[in-house]
Amino acid sequence: LLSPGPGIPEEAGDLMAAIGQIVRQRIPVLGICLGHQALARAFGAELRQLSAPLHGHPTTLTVTDAGDLLLQKIAPPLIVGRYHSWVVDPDSMPEELIASSHDEAGHIMSFYHRNLPIHGVQFHPESCISNCGPALIRNWLATC
């Protein structure tokens, strides 16, 4: 589990090196917020700063790829808590990462890797704002 944190992935100590090891060893991983951004960066995606930070902000997800095991068997609406000021740039998403949900503005809120046990969520499933957090974590654990 790659947890949330301040800043951007390249400023997060050995995070990017750790992701390299995770990928090489095919270790199942879930990136949350900063972890989501770091996983995307590790595969070549770029980040984009939002015009205003979203801290403690509820968002309704639109699931755009039903193949994401994290989001299966969760009844809509999926409301999630956001605490970030950066997002993955959708124009830079590599082919091996599949965006699976978006917010109202079209920002990527989750993705999974086409061939590896890698998932990322921009939001915080552990937040009291998120109505789908426990189910999402159970779904992830079932993939491990």
Where are these regions (language model features)?
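Flexible gly/pro-rich beta->alpha loop and the following alpha-helix that scaffold active-site loops
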Residues: 1-31, 37, 43
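Conserved strand-to-helix beginnings and helix N-cap segments that scaffold or border functional pockets
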Residues: 12-16, 93, 133-134
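Alpha-helical elements of Rossmann-like donor-binding domains used by nucleotide-donor carbohydrate transfer enzymes
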Residues: 17-18, 98, 135-139
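Pocket-forming structural segment of enzyme catalytic cores
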Residues: 20-22, 40-118, 123-131
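Active-site phosphate/pyrophosphate- and oxyanion-stabilizing loops and adjacent acidic/basic residues
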Residues: 37, 68, 138
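Acyltransferase
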Residues: 128-144
